[in-house]
């Protein structure tokens, strides 16, 4: 199944994060914080402005992004994988390089 977000929505696959502390302690899944980085896997057509124009999104498929800890509260399971759906304005930055 393929997910096509609408308007200014973005679909993100969370990055896998190490579940070890700096001291080498392995954290159980419930104690580890969810990663706030991911890869954009789908983008909508753009934000519809008040005058009816559509503004293209600043992110594109394949971008590595950083988002806040409470962003992307909409999780969707697609082909056994949990994906986040969030508005573009919930993305804080694009990781370059």
UniProtKB/Swiss-Prot annotation:
InterPro entries: Chaperonin_GroES, Chaperonin_GroES_sf, Chaprnonin_Cpn10_CS, GroES-like_sf. GO terms for biological process: chaperone cofactor-dependent protein refolding. GO terms for cellular component: cytoplasm. Keywords: Chaperone, Cytoplasm. It is found in: Cytoplasm. One of its GO terms (molecular function) is metal ion binding. It comes from the Bacteria. Pfam families: Cpn10 (PF00166). Its main location: cytoplasm. CDD domains: cpn10. Together with the chaperonin GroEL, plays an essential role in assisting protein folding. The GroEL-GroES system forms a nano-cage that allows encapsulation of the non-native substrate proteins and provides a physical environment optimized to promote and accelerate protein folding. GroES binds to the apical surface of the GroEL ring, thereby capping the opening of the GroEL channel. Heptamer of 7 subunits arranged in a ring. Interacts with the chaperonin GroEL. Belongs to the GroES chaperonin family. HAMAP family: CH10. This is Co-chaperonin GroES. It comes from Pseudomonas putida (strain ATCC 47054 / DSM 6125 / CFBP 8728 / NCIMB 11950 / KT2440). The lineage of its organism: Bacteria, Pseudomonadati, Pseudomonadota, Gammaproteobacteria, Pseudomonadales.
């Amino acid at each position: 199944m393929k997910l096509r977000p609408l308007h200014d929505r973005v679909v993100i696959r969370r990055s896998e994060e190490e579940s070890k502390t700096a001291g080498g302690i392995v954290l159980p899944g419930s104690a580890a914080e969810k990663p706030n980085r991911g890869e954009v896997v789908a983008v909508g057509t753009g934000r519809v402005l008040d005058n009816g124009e559509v503004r293209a999104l600043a992110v594109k498929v394949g971008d590595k992004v950083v988002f806040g800890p409470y962003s992307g509260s909409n999780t969707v399971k697609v082909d056994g994988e949990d994906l986040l759906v969030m508005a573009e304005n919930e993305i804080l930055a694009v990781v370059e390089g």
